Amino acid sequence: MLLKQTKIVASISDRRCDVDFIKQLFEAGMNVVRMNTAHASREGFEALIANVRAVSNRIAILMDTKGPEVRTTANAEPIPYKIGEKVKIVGNPDLETTRECIAVSYPNFVSDLNIGGTILIDDGDLELEVIDKTDGYLLCEVKNDATLGSRKSVNVPGVRINLPSLTEKDRNNILYAIEKDIDFIAHSFVRNRQDVLDIREILDAHNSDIKIIAKIENQEGVDNIDEILEVADGVMVARGDLGIEVPQERIPGIQRVLIRKCILAKKPGIVATQMLHTMINNPRPTRAEVTDIANAIYYRTDALMLSGETAYGKYPVEAVKTMTKVAAQAEKDKLEENDIRIPLDENSNDVTAFLAKQAVKATSKLKIRAIITDSYSGRTARNLAAFRGKYPVLAICYKEKTMRHLALSYGVEAIYMPELANGQQYYFAALRRLLKEGRLQPSDMVGYLSSGKAGTKTSFLEINVVEDALKHAEETVLPNNNRYL
């Protein structure tokens, strides 16, 4: 069974992606590998993808896009600034940044900003205030001592930057993700539903089933979360840029609201950024970091993400092991009365959601060891995950891709099994496999949600003891198109 029910996403660099390293992370509790397109070459991606697939077909791969971001241009060497100094800013991606003039990648940067605005560079390390504006440049005052490196992030809190959702590099990377059959695309700086639909249009044109995770990194994304969740397949609370774009004291509350909305939408939510930041250089986390992980789980997140901790940190395997141990304990300690109650829409006639809720409720009344579902698209398993049962969901998947698409869903252990039998015989084959692998015992009671046929909607819930289900398999017939139970 699962080491923990909360899933772990680990960022991996092409500079450290050998098979042994990935295997260690997987065995420590990693479920998804994140590839950052800002920091790797195409050759590096090739090696990373091949090595992940060599370790296990159960590890999902998530690719980041850059999205509508603004960066400074290159500068020959780091530039020191002192508080009170004046510096010009221009929007010219072809101009080199100098001490007197900082150039940024967005041509209309000057026109989008006003006097009195704040500009934060390099995740807020350098703060500037706009004190004058001309047609060609902004004159800014330096608000703190800092050193500026090359191609650093630029954030403008409270200002909408009118950049297109996708860069040309993003489009090329999406086509590459389709070619390599990547599992998830995490799109940066999602502001509204159209930003998601821009990616969906490309995927649909190539008949791709890649799932889209919307990274919420600014106030506009927070404000439009409901419409974003209508079209995205999940959400990442990207606390790094979000903590720059909105006041940092609001981050915990925003995190809680976004997780809740993901659960109500029955789509996975990921909490990211600085979960174990000190473990980049230290073998042990701070107490605050341990509490941060636990609180995200108490909020009922599906997944947690490690960034620099595993991409370039000194203790990557230890970081995953630490997160696994903290998650497992937090899952035991969380209070059931704080579970998010998902109302059933009486007008929707959503049989899948109704049966999923009853299956999870049954685990609190009966000694059910696990809930089993056969899964073609993963929808039933995601419904079960949303209700946050105490025991794992064993999703027996007809397709490998579905198995990996469930790698972000809380409490779901997805298992790929080709459709060797029809209808209920697939269920019996799954039970025999689970017994053989030691995941279940003959005396275990299980719940089973299915439609009886791959690709059709869930239509019944059965609760039975494993050995009884198999013993009477050829004797009992349900009124479900005469498929054997």
Residue map of PLM features:
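Non-catalytic helical/linker scaffolds that mediate oligomerization, partner binding
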Residues: M1-L485
